[in-house]
UniProtKB/Swiss-Prot annotation:
Belongs to the UPF0145 family. InterPro entries: UPF0145_dom_sf, UPF0145_YbjQ-like. The lineage of its organism: Archaea, Thermoproteota, Thermoprotei, Sulfolobales, Sulfolobaceae. It comes from Saccharolobus islandicus (strain Y.G.57.14 / Yellowstone #1). It comes from the Archaea. This is UPF0145 protein YG5714_0873. Pfam families: YbjQ_1 (PF01906).
Length: 114
């Protein structure tokens, strides 16, 4: 995956086809904490009675993952990276209404193969 506006290649793989890692800069992390809030919890409770997808939580989860990913990419750029490999996501419940979403990977400099 490439983020042209950030000029950073991003992948869950250890390598990027067509590129060689020329320098490993270190681990980069992006974190966000989201609160479901009273309204979200109420809507989820009502939807859980009838079953099905809880769209409010899906949207919140997608936004949180993207924000964590963007923050991780920003950290990589601060180190001078032009790629991040081995990206992973993790999440933790901090309390009944707050979740922590983490994106992490290895910031690297890559060069395009000739």
């Amino acid at each position: 995956m490439s983020y042209p506006e950030a000029n950073v290649l991003v992948t869950t793989a250890e390598t990027i086809p067509g590129y060689t890692i020329v320098e490993v800069l270190g681990i980069v992390v992006g974190i966000t904490v989201r609160s479901r809030g009273l309204g979200g919890n109420l809507m989820a409770a009502l939807r859980s009675l009838v079953g099905g997808e809880i769209k409010e939580f899906v949207e919140m989860a997608e936004q949180a993952r993207m924000q964590a990913l963007i923050r991780m990419i920003d950290r990589a750029k601060e180190l001078g990276a032009n790629a991040v490999v081995n990206i992973r996501f993790d999440s933790n419940e901090l309390n009944q209404s707050m979740d922590e979403i983490i994106a992490y990977g290895t910031a690297v400099k890559v060069a395009k193969n000739s």
